Amino acid sequence: FAHCLRVRSRAEVEAFYRAALEAGARDNGAPGPRPEYEENYYACFVLDPDGYNIEAMLNEPAPQG
């Protein structure tokens, strides 16, 4: 079972990750690019105390140009 939270910035992904770990969650993937999902996907993953995976993600628009 998993939950995914869409956020507005990389800073919010990183803040979620830090807050979750401080609250007792376990690391399941530090903040970073996830090109295996999509080219501009940035996310982190934590496991809550019940073992559920929680993701904070940002799918940024492709660069223009």
Outline where the language-model segments fall:
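Vicinal oxygen chelate
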Residues: 3-49
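Glycine-rich acetyl-CoA-binding "A-motif" of GNAT/NAT acetyltransferases
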Residues: 53
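A short acidic/small-residue loop/turn micro-motif
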Residues: 35-36, 59-63
